[in-house]
């Protein structure tokens, strides 16, 4: 699964760069996978890939992401590539202890970045 994860990270780097973000990949750091910024918004991203229709992410993984993001001054983001659906993103909250992530739990990259609004009118 490492190869799929690294490939997904590189794919997400290209998507973020298309939207004007500078991106650094932090392979093997055990903290975050990507750090991205555009001078206005800074994202600390944990990247996951799954063939399933859901993904369980534990408290420990989210705790590392949240703590790094707090220290860095960025937004903690979980990016999941569902192989049969595509990319979905969610801002991670410290209140979450364990989380089952499904495609309907997240938003598109454009909504996350504030480029596109959701049907509820939220950006």
From Swiss-Prot:
GO molecular function: crossover junction DNA endonuclease activity; DNA binding; magnesium ion binding
Effect of residue 56 to A: 30% HJ cleavage
HAMAP family: HJ_Resolv_Hjc
Effect of residue 72 to A: No HJ cleavage; at very high levels altered cleavage patterns. Dimerizes poorly
pH curve summary: Optimum pH is 8-10.
Cofactor note: Divalent cations, Mg(2+) has higher activity than Mn(2+).
Protein function: A structure-specific endonuclease that resolves Holliday junction (HJ) intermediates during genetic recombination. Cleaves 4-way DNA junctions introducing paired nicks in opposing strands, leaving a 5'-terminal phosphate and a 3'-terminal hydroxyl group that are subsequently ligated to produce recombinant products. Cleaves both mobile and immobile junctions. Binds 4-way junction DNA, a synthetic Hj, binding is not competed by dsDNA.
Result of altering residue 81 to A: No HJ cleavage. Slight decrease in DNA binding
Top-level division of the source organism's lineage: Archaea
UniProt name for this protein: Crossover junction endodeoxyribonuclease Hjc
Catalyzed chemical reaction(s): Endonucleolytic cleavage at a junction such as a reciprocal single-stranded crossover between two homologous DNA duplexes (Holliday junction)
Organism the protein comes from: Pyrococcus furiosus (strain ATCC 43587 / DSM 3638 / JCM 8422 / Vc1)
InterPro entries found in the cross-reference section: Hjc, Hjc_arc, Restrct_endonuc-II-like, tRNA_endonuc-like_dom_sf
GO BP: DNA recombination; DNA repair
Keyword DNA repair: yes
Temperature dependence: Optimum temperature is 70-75 degrees Celsius, enzyme is fully active after 16 hours at 90 degrees Celsius.
Phenotype when changing residue 10 to A: No HJ cleavage
Site (Transition state stabilizer): 48
Cofactor(s) in the UniProt record: Mg(2+); Mn(2+)
EC number: 3.1.21.10
Binding site for Mg(2+): 9, 33, 46
Active site per database record: 29
Gene: hjc
Family stated for the protein in its record: Belongs to the Holliday junction resolvase Hjc family.
UniProt key word Protein biosynthesis: no
Key words of the record: DNA damage, DNA recombination, DNA repair, DNA-binding, Endonuclease, Hydrolase, Magnesium, Metal-binding, Nuclease
Effect of residue 68 to A: No HJ cleavage. Dimerizes poorly
Cellular component per GO, a single term: Holliday junction resolvase complex
């Amino acid at each position: 699964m490492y190869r799929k994860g690294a490939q997904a990270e590189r794919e997400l780097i290209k998507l973020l760069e298309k939207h004007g973000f500078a991106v650094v990949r932090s392979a093997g750091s055990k903290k975050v996978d990507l750090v991205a910024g555009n001078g206005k918004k800074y994202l600390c991203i944990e990247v996951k890939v799954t063939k399933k229709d859901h993904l369980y992410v534990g408290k420990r993984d989210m705790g590392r992401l949240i703590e790094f993001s707090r220290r860095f001054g960025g937004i903690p983001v979980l990016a999941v590539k569902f192989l049969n659906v595509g990319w979905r993103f969610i801002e991670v909250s410290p209140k979450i202890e364990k989380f089952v992530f499904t495609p309907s739990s997240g938003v598109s990259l454009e909504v996350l970045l504030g480029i596109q609004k959701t049907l509820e009118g939220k950006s």
